[in-house]
Amino acid sequence: MPEDLESFLRAGTAPVVVTLGSAMAQAGKVFAETAKAALALGRRVVVLTRHPEQLPTLPPEAFVAHWAPLGPLFSRAALVVHHGGIGTTAQAIAGGVPQLILPFAHDQPDNAHILKRHGLGDFHDPHRLRLGRLKAQMQAILASKEIAKACAKRAQMNQNTHGEVLAADSLEQLVEGFSA
C-alpha cells in the first residue's frame, strides 16, 4: 500500500473506494458525482485514477491515488463503486465489501446483474448519473444488513475453496488421462 494512502486509511473510518479501471480517461463527471455522493453521506472517499487531472478539487476527506493494490484496499473499504470489470468485481467479492457497479460496456452489465442477483450490491447506469439517486443507492447498500451478510458469506466461501488444490487435482487427473 502506498504510504500516503496507508496514512489516509488509518486516519479515519472505512472509505468509499471509487475506481473505473485503468482505461477510463474521460470519466471526470462519473468520478466527481460518485465522490460527491459519498462525501454528502459523510463518508471518506478514495478515488483511484490514472488521470487525476479530470477531477475537480476535492476536500481533505477525499484521497486521490494513481494506483493501489485492490485486494488490501477493498478489504478496508465500506463500499466499492466501480465499472464492473471481472477483476475488480472479483477482488471486491474476495474482500467481502459491498459494491455499486457503474457498467459501461463489454461484460460489465452482466457482471452487475449477477452481483445484484447474489445480493452483493447494486448497479447504476453511468450515463444517467444523478446525485440524489447515487446517494440513495449508496446509503441503501451501506445500511443493508442483508448485503453485508451476503458479502461476508461470499468472501468466506472464496477463502475456503483452496483453488490451488483444485487446480492441481484437475491437472493430475488430466495428466493421468494422457498416460492411460
What do the PLM-derived regions correspond to, one by one?
Residues P60, G95-G96, K116-G121:
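Acidic, glycine-centered active-site loop in nucleotide-sugar glycosyltransferases
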Residues M24-A27, E53-P56, T88-T89, D107-P109, ...:
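Flexible loop/turn segments at secondary-structure boundaries
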Residues M1-L79:
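Donor-nucleotide binding loops and adjacent catalytic segments primarily
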Residues L131-A180:
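C-terminal amphipathic helix plus adjacent low-complexity
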Residues V45-V47, L100-I101, D122-H124:
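Short hydrophobic alpha-helical runs that function as membrane-insertion/retention elements
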Residues A65-I114:
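A donor-sugar binding/catalytic signature common to diverse glycosyltransferases
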